[in-house]
């Protein structure tokens, strides 16, 4: 259900900074040779960055420093002003490779345990993407073409070679509905996602803000599911199977004008 997240301010800065500093002071080969098996695993999987201090002048670099771990990106802001993380937790659970299988609450708990040295329970989530897969008896692309709007905001249909999707944007969040069949081995699958960019959208459910600890509670996942269902129920779409010959003039007008979200 949870995929992408972004945390703007991580509490465990020292732990992440140690990895960044260690990886930058030595070459990759030197790092691999002088750390233990677990350290080698981390370095080989992920960590990469630029120079922090010019060894000739002693000047601090103003470049952001990045570390990549199974698809997650940790970023240190110049001058040590902040540390953030972003990426797909679903892909992380698959070694950073894919997110086309199921990602359950238990899978997330395993991810949280693996990341406990890097993300603190009190770290606040700034962006999160939640979604669910729906099996359909028809090609999902047909449903995408029937989408009209969500709360007055039109859906934009985007047709790419590897993905067909429809998006409706709001100030605090974005709804994305797309055909995931290509990623599911051809099985007819519709994906419904809500990407929350402003945590005010969660205010009624998480009045104190959404934290990493909240994500580790099953009741939070139940809340996400309810929000997804409510949001999807608010989507306005047209049913192309309606027989117009059996409609009254008033009903026919609704069909003809219904693709206008202002109507």
Regions found by a protein language model. Give the residues of each.
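Structured, helix-rich domain cores that form ligand/interaction pockets
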Residues: 1-262
């Amino acid at each position: 259900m949870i995929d992408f997240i972004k945390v703007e301010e991580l509490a465990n800065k020292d732990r992440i900074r140690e990895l960044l500093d260690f990886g930058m002071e030595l070459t990759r080969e030197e790092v691999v040779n002088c750390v233990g098996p677990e350290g080698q695993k981390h370095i080989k999987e992920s960590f990469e960055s630029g120079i922090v201090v010019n060894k000739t002048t002693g000047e601090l670099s103003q470049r952001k420093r990045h570390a990549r771990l199974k698809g997650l990106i940790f970023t240190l802001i110049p001058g040590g002003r902040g540390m953030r993380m972003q990426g797909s937790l679903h892909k992380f659970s698959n070694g950073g490779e894919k997110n086309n299988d199921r990602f359950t609450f238990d899978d997330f708990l395993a991810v949280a345990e693996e990341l406990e040295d890097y993300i603190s329970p009190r770290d606040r989530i700034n962006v999160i993407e939640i979604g669910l897969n729906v099996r359909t008896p028809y090609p999902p692309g047909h449903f995408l073409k029937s989408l009209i709007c969500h709360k007055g905001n039109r859906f934009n249909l985007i047709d790419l070679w590897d993905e067909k999707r429809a998006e409706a944007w709001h100030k605090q969040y974005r709804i994305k509905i797309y055909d995931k069949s290509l990623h599911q081995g051809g099985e007819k699958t519709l994906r419904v996602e809500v990407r929350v960019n402003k945590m005010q959208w969660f205010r009624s459910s998480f009045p104190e803000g959404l934290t990493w600890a909240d994500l580790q509670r099953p009741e939070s996942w139940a809340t996400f599911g309810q929000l997804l269902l409510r949001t999807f129920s608010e989507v306005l779409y047209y049913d192309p199977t309606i027989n117009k010959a059996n409609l009254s003039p008033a009903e026919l007008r609704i069909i003809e004008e219904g693709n206008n979200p202002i109507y």
